[in-house]
Amino acid sequence: MLEVIGTDAGGLAGLVPPSLALVRAAELLVAPARLLAELEPWWRAEQAAGRISAGSPCPQLLASDRPELIFGAVEQALAAGRPAVLLASGDPLWFGIGRLLLQRFPAAQLRFHPAPCSLQLAFARLGRPWQDASWISLHGRDPEPLAAALQKRPSALAVLTDPSR
């Protein structure tokens, strides 16, 4: 089973206890590079606090920034029955890596643990309901649809971006 765990803006510090238990038990841990940077120091701190046994090695760490490069390692872990965790931002099934995983792996091999997404948190900060907002994702996508979305003059338009946009 691949446990796909959403994180909020707090990263590892924002995970709930059941998700932390899955991370501690993982033999393969896949995450964006920004979260991977936190993992080794976090692992050592968990060992120092006695939440992970002192002799327990840090799991295999793999960056998910280019998802096509993780599939082989995930397939091997699943075939061998090794505990595997993939950390993602927010809700992995909302404009996230979850769609790609479902295209590649049977749903029975995936379990999703969503966290609030960035736009959900933004609307909460604004004190605005978000069910009537229009959404567009430019994350790794062509920005051309943004112009068409803006021409429709929605009352609220939320735009997901990535570091290059």
Which role does the model predict for each range below?
Residues 1-113, 120-121, 141-143, 156:
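Class I S-adenosyl-L-methionine
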Residues 5-6, 136, 160:
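Conserved beta-strand segments of the P-loop GTPase G domain that flank and frequently precede/overlap
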Residues 124-128, 148-150:
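Active-site-proximal loop->helix
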Residues 129-134:
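Short, structured loop/turn "capping" segments at alpha-beta junctions
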Residues 135-148:
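A short, charged helix-loop
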Residues 145-165:
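Conserved anion/nucleotide-ligand pocket segment
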